[in-house]
Regions:
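Extreme N-terminal basic, low-complexity initiation segments
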Residues: 2-8
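Alpha-helical metal-binding/catalytic segments enriched in His/Glu/Asp
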Residues: 76-77
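Extended beta-strand/beta-hairpin segments
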Residues: 6, 18-71, 81-166
Length: 166
C-alpha cells in the first residue's frame, strides 16, 4: 500500500494529545528582520522581543534565545520554590536568583553550562531547607534541559547570623 492510498484513512483518525501532555500554551512569534523576533504570549497578550547576541552576528539589544533558556531556568526554580513556600506559609519576599550562561566553544553552538546563585532570605538551618532545594532541582525547565548542560546551583541562605553557601 502506498502512502497516497493510506492518506484518506489516516486523516479520519482524530488528532489526540499525547497522554503526558497536560496543558498547552500558545505563543505566536514573528521574525521582524535584522535578527529580531517578537513573541506574543496568547493567554496574557504580553510581548517579548529577542535579538541575536553580539557574538553571533546580532546587536545584543534584547534577550537572545539562549538567554531566555537561562532566564526560564532561573524563573522556573524561583517559581517552584515559591509554590512550595506558599504551601508551607514561608515568606520568601526578597528571594533572588542570578544566572550565568556559558556557550560551548566547539560546534554545534549550544549552552554548555548554567550557573545559578540562589539567594534565599531564610537561615541555613531552616527546617524546610532540603524541601526548597529539592523543589528547585525538580522544576520543569530543569527536567527539560539536555543532560549535557552542566547546571550548578550555589545556595546562599541569608536569614540569620549563620549565613552559609551551599
Amino acid at each position: 500500500m502506498d502512502s497516497a492510498s493510506c492518506l484518506p484513512k489516516c486523516r479520519q483518525k482524530p488528532i489526540e494529545s499525547p497522554p503526558h501532555s497536560v496543558t498547552m500554551v500558545e505563543i505566536n512569534l514573528s521574525y521582524e528582520g535584522d535578527l529580531h523576533c517578537s513573541a506574543v504570549h496568547i493567554p496574557s497578550g504580553n510581548i517579548l522581543v529577542t535579538d541575536a547576541p553580539v557574538d553571533n552576528n546580532g546587536r545584543g539589544q534584547a534577550f537572545s534565545p539562549t538567554d531566555l533558556v537561562a532566564t526560564a531556568l532561573a524563573s522556573c526554580m524561583a517559581t517552584v520554590i515559591g509554590i512550595v513556600a506558599r504551601r508551607k506559609d514561608i515568606d520568601l519576599a526578597g528571594m533572588k536568583v542570578n544566572v550565568r550562561k556559558f556557550m560551548s566553544e566547539d560546534q554545534p553552538r549550544r549552552i554548555s553550562r548554567l550557573e545559578l546563585d540562589l539567594d534565599i532570605p531564610l537561615p541555613a538551618h531552616h527546617p524546610e531547607r532540603k524541601l526548597l532545594e529539592s523543589a528547585a532541582r525538580g522544576c520543569p525547565v530543569h527536567h527539560s534541559l539536555h543532560p549535557d548542560i552542566d547546571v550548578k546551583m550555589n545556595w546562599n541562605w541569608r536569614g540569620g547570623p549563620d549565613q552559609i553557601a551551599g
